[in-house]
Amino acid sequence: SIFATMRTLAEQSREIDMLTLKEELSKRAQLDQVGGAGYISSLADGIPDVANVERYARIVKEKSMLRRLIVMGNTVMRAALDAPHEPAEVLNIAEQTLYKIAEGSIDKGFVQLDRITRKNMEAIEALQHAGKLITGIPTGYDRFDEFTSGFQSQDLVILAARPSMGKTSFMMNIAEAIAIPTREGGPRAPSQRLYSVGVFSLEMSKEQIGLRMLSSESGVSNHLIRAGMLSERNWRDLAEASTRLAKAKIYVDDTPGIDVMELRAKARRLKMEVGLDMVMVDYLQLMAVKGRVESRNQEISQISRGLKGVAKELNLPLISLSQLSRRPEQRTGDHRPQLADLRESGSIEQDADLVAFIYRDEVYNKDTEEKGIAEIIIAKQRNGPIGDFKLVFRNDITKFFNYEPSPDFVPE
């Protein structure tokens, strides 16, 4: 009761001393319950030297951490002794609990609304003073950032398209934009710093990912690289690109058929070891589910829900690619994808904070006037507008560029 009353006074920005504490306890008819005015006065006699308050607080924090480690040890021991638990599951429990302790986070349960809104107002005020249009991690594309203000922490972002639209290329181009330094060694505008990205590639090998990034970053055609038909200029461009890529904090895991639990454990470990700002998955439908599941829909639901959980636990945006059903091909006239086309489960739409489709008309219409043009269709955004915008796509180097609506625009 005494501490709760002191906390109330602090939340009301009122002074905390013996007089105000006694007065507030009297108003609540709790003064006698806590020992009376004499006990409150005696508490002041036991106050240690305030000059060492930081050291005292550190001791309390350290003891709290040790107690939590003891509790964690008991929890892991019980899980290990419980027959139904698989070793990998026990390891995941241990890592998850240890991560929370290391990050200083605990499961607080219910939080009163006034504390939530006060924190909201502080965040809004900070954004107002910062005066930035991008409050999350930049996408590398101006119009995308205008719609989203960047990728936000704890968001599950789904990038979906039919085959050959450039899903993997678009995802990796975003990684390149935020993680690879410029020739001068700094971040690319509008990024304020270089970010670290963890990529789970279930479709392509890490070597294939590396070749694509070399082509995209150097501007040297994929075909020329694979055929070994490189000029002296090509070699120079590739060498420069390789130097920049070597400085990027992009980590690729190409384990096939990974499940959510293993992905979470690897991402958590990477964040603890080197830091992690974003996770990317290529792609959702290739992930595995442990145990028996009644239907494919339930499998996908379990995966999408798990990916959202990873984003929340690690407090970062998670970008996942997703396949679409064949419905766009079956529609006559307009083949642009819709939310109903998300393959095998409506839960992807429900779990995602943002769903964006990639559409290139030239894939369906060879005579289109929009050759080399891609549309990014933001079909769902939980905390922002929906709409679409255009990008330029160069298939020879699998790279997307900002779209400039001038007839003589050529990507650099």
Where in this protein do the model-derived segments appear?
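Noncatalytic partner-interaction/assembly domains of nucleic-acid and motor enzyme complexes
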Residues: 1-64
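C-terminal regions of RecA-like/P-loop NTPase motor modules
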Residues: 225, 259-276, 305-315, 327-412
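Helical hairpin unit composed of two closely spaced alpha helices linked by a short loop
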Residues: 276-320
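Cytosolic-facing regulatory segments adjacent to core modules
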Residues: 146, 177, 181-275, 289, ...
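Conserved lysine of the Walker
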Residues: 167
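The conserved Walker
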Residues: 163
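Pre-Walker A segment
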Residues: 89, 100-155
